[in-house]
Amino acid sequence: PDITKCVIVKSPVRINGSTIGAAKNIAVQTGGSLTIQGNGSLLVKDFIRNQTGSANNFVVESDANLLQVNNVSNTGAITVKRDAHKMRYLEYTYWASPVSGQTFKSFSPTTPDARFYQYNESNDLFESIQNPSTNVFGNNKSGTFESAAKGYAIRYYGTSNLFTGTFKGVPNNGDITFPLKFKSGATGQGYGYNMVGNPYPSNIDFYKLHAANSTLIYNTAYFWTNINPNGAMQGSNYPNGALINNYAVLNGTGGVGATSSSAVNGSQTPNQFIKVGQGFIVKAKAAGDLQFTNGDGTNGIRTSNNSGHFFNNRGTTVDRFWLELKTP
């Protein structure tokens, strides 16, 4: 099919990693299923409908891309996966949901309620979305990723070094706005930071995001890496006076990986392409609505370019010989 053809899926269909699929609109009906494998992509001009009643019948695998051109509503839940490699117990990752209605506890069931964090621009600290007086999600009553393009820091409590984040819900589409906060009268370097995220089931281009919002945000994105395994640097305690850095940084001149004083290599270097499910931090120049413009190519920020990295990915251990020198 091409982008001028309406597609109805009545039997299992798989888009392989080397395939770029296209359709005017697509409907998956009873008996059908659609899977986009890693490095594969599907571009849909109009709507997506999963009419099977199960999100498992429409799957976007990790490193696959589902793109849409027009600002139309979708119906029916799908599954979007994001692999996070080399995860360690108690580490954080910055996440954002590419679907609506995803709950925190179904996304990361072993994470305690108090270890889902949002960022508070007004005091430059992370805060739990849990209400400490009731031990429930009092600061986020629905217990869900509240809005498209909002980022969250989530602690990992698993035992494997590979975590597959699984999002289930109606895929986000259309132009999306995120209300940037900026503390009134603030002039210090610690203010204006907002945790946002990629709101789509496709990669996005940060440079295009900045170009569309250059009066509101600086041309810099910060990605948390966990390259420095220091518990005191987690959450609102960062950086705890340390002279090391857990953030990989992208700006207008390129990317810089996070640095470490421990026996690991530096983190991957970010480029302009931000992966599905990725949360990150931007600094606002003023309060206002950050605009995520739908569409691909010149008409929007969405892209199938897979050359970027998903952060949390740490460097590999470096073998070292330690020498002790003594006088005779």
Region roles according to the model:
Residues D2-G40, F47-F58:
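Beta-strand repeat architectures
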Residues K5-V9, I26, K150-I154, F280-I281:
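Short hydrophobic/aromatic-rich beta-strand motifs
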Residues S122-K141, T164-L180, S184-A186, T225-T269, ...:
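Surface-exposed intrinsically disordered loops and tails
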Residues N265, T269, F273-I281:
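C-terminus-biased signal that marks the final domain/tail of proteins
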